[in-house]
UniProtKB/Swiss-Prot annotation:
Location of region: Disordered: 310-330
The keyword Cytoplasm is assigned to this record: no
Keyword annotations from UniProtKB, A to Z: Oxidoreductase, tRNA processing
InterPro entries: Rhodanese-like_dom, Rhodanese-like_dom_sf, TrhO, TRHO_N
Chemical reaction(s) catalysed: uridine(34) in tRNA + AH2 + O2 = 5-hydroxyuridine(34) in tRNA + A + H2O
Active-site residues annotated for this sequence: C177 (cysteine persulfide intermediate)
Stated name of the protein: tRNA uridine(34) hydroxylase
Domain Rhodanese positions: 123-217
A molecular function GO annotation: oxidoreductase activity, acting on paired donors, with incorporation or reduction of molecular oxygen
GO biological process: tRNA modification
Organism whose genome encodes this protein: Francisella philomiragia subsp. philomiragia (strain ATCC 25017 / CCUG 19701 / FSC 153 / O#319-036)
Source species taxonomy: Bacteria, Pseudomonadati, Pseudomonadota, Gammaproteobacteria, Thiotrichales
Record field: compositional bias (Basic and acidic residues): 317-330
PROSITE patterns associated with the record: RHODANESE_3
Amino acid sequence: MSQIVVCAMYKFVTLEDYEAMRQPLLDTMIKNNVKGTLLLANEGINGTVAGSREGVNALLAYLKSDSRLADIDYKESYHQEMPFYRSKVKLKKEIVTLGIEEIDPNKVCGKYVEPKDWNALISDPETILVDTRNDYEIEIGTFKNAINPSTETFREFPEYVDKNLDPKKHKKVAMFCTGGIRCEKSTALMKAKGFDEVYHLKGGILKYLEEVPKEESMWEGECFVFDSRVAVNHDLEKGSYDQCFACRMPITEEDKKRPEYVKGISCHHCYDKVTEEQKARFAEREKQSQLAAERGFSHVGDDAKKLAKLNKQQKQQAKEIARKKAKSEI
């Protein structure tokens, strides 16, 4: 089986016609059997997709045919299975939600730092290194000596900056995230708040893992990704984590041995937060997922449509058999 290409991409660029771009972009994804989600907003494009080498190439070629996206930033990795179930293009106010409209990376942001130069920057004792990702992402991997802002969502990051960072005290700040988009917007926020020397890792963690040899790496752990792989290791291969269906938090094999873990229903992160009604709903979904798997289908996405069609056909056939049987007994 040929490997699936997983492509994370983004670009901050003014797209005044972003609403009109949606359907042609979705059509291109479907035509080339590329799955995943792309976000469009006035400020740009962001998302992660997956497909065959030919399919992803066709999508990138389509995007680059628009002069505004000719130099779109993207990172690739590979997986044995399709990590997404559907093809989606969504319209948003922001391609990454900070919640402050006046922050515009198209106007001002920090200085890009190439992966090969990143170690030198973060080894400088005068550099404050800040991980702009969420707490559950940082928990499974981050750079050595990086500060964890302990945020649950990116919207909380401005509050962290206001309470913990001072442009007069913190003269040199380096920031990073998974693919580069959050740290780029974060540096725009920092510049707006008066910080002068602000740097961000070009291409994010994924580009760093791709370009920096393991023996030179300052990365510790695995990198959380927003698809069914859950995390990738330094070789950009699927890591050792799974994901709780209920709360979407990453979990280890050891976590699965805990009494709070019930496959598809709860884990130690959410056991006391999930209602009985939710648990019952999750249990039914898990049951349907197992039945679908036994038939060689996925319970979600395009396979779900095929499964629903098959179930409908089987019900119709059963009704027809019952009708004929009843007729023969008359």
